[in-house]
């Protein structure tokens, strides 16, 4: 598929239903943040479109208009698409691996765990960008959907457990943010695991999301993406 320039984007509601949970919030997130890309089978009057961000892809439209070779940019990605796209996905890649995720429906308040001495759980601010950038390379995925550590730090959609020296021990954030739902990512550094820091960050983030959404909260916790050689996709992605 061809990547569309910012001034020639398709009308989002026509292709993707707004207000859906999980990665379905991706189009709203890309539109609002400018992080990610829109794709189409052709620039004028597209018959199929895709939106991608941080290794995740949503497909919509007529799969018959998509030659397998047009999907090459989405190799090694997590793909969510209607079932009708499975034949062309199977033709485009050596391996298509279905991926299922647990969806948590948050309805009851949860008492936040008390962090250990010397650790503060708080909202990220722009001054936290260097601490996020200092995370290991294996942890860099946590800010990919915001375009980098500076984007996540300034987003007002992230909470972190920070020690006295300003190091980030755990972080939870809205990975894909929509008007009705946010897809949540959470990360704890290896040396600070089993201290309930991730739970403390997620609890604070969920309270923040609920205060903004004023309604039911549906969350997906996500692990670092590890797609196989080929395409990692299926329903759901």
Curated annotation (Swiss-Prot):
Coiled coil spans: none
InterPro entries: Acyl_CoA_acyltransferase (IPR016181), GNAT_dom (IPR000182)
One of the record's GO molecular function terms: acyltransferase activity, transferring groups other than amino-acyl groups
Keyword Transferase attached: yes
UniProt keyword list: Acyltransferase, Transferase
Enzyme Commission designation: 2.3.1.-
Signal sequence interval, chain numbering: none
Domain spans labelled N-acetyltransferase: 119-237
Cited SUPFAM superfamilies: Acyl-CoA N-acyltransferases (Nat)
Name by which UniProt lists this protein: Uncharacterized N-acetyltransferase in mutA 5'region
């Amino acid at each position: 598929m061809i990547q569309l320039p910012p001034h020639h984007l398709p009308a989002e509601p026509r292709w993707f239903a707004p207000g859906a949970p999980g990665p379905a919030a991706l189009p709203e997130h890309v539109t609002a943040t400018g992080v990610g890309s829109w794709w189409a089978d052709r620039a004028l009057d597209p018959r199929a479109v895709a939106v991608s961000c941080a290794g995740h892809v949503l497909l919509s439209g007529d799969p018959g208009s998509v030659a397998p070779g047009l999907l090459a940019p989405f190799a090694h990605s997590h793909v969510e698409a209607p079932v009708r796209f499975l034949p062309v996905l199977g033709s485009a890649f050596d391996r298509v691996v279905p991926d299922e995720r647990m969806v948590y429906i948050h309805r009851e308040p949860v008492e936040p765990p008390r962090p250990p001495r010397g650790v503060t759980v708080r909202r990220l601010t722009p001054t936290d960008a260097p601490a996020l950038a200092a995370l290991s390379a294996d942890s860099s995925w946590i800010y990919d959907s915001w375009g980098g550590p500076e984007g996540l730090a300034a987003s007002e959609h992230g909470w972190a457990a920070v020690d006295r020296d300003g190091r980030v021990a755990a972080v939870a954030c809205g990975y894909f943010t929509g008007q009705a739902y946010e897809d949540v990512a959470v990360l704890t550094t290896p040396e600070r695991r089993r201290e309930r820091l991730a739970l403390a960050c997620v609890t604070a983030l969920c309270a923040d999301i609920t205060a903004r959404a004023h309604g039911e909260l549906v969350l997906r916790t996500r692990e670092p993406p590890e797609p196989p050689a080929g395409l990692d996709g299926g329903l759901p992605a």
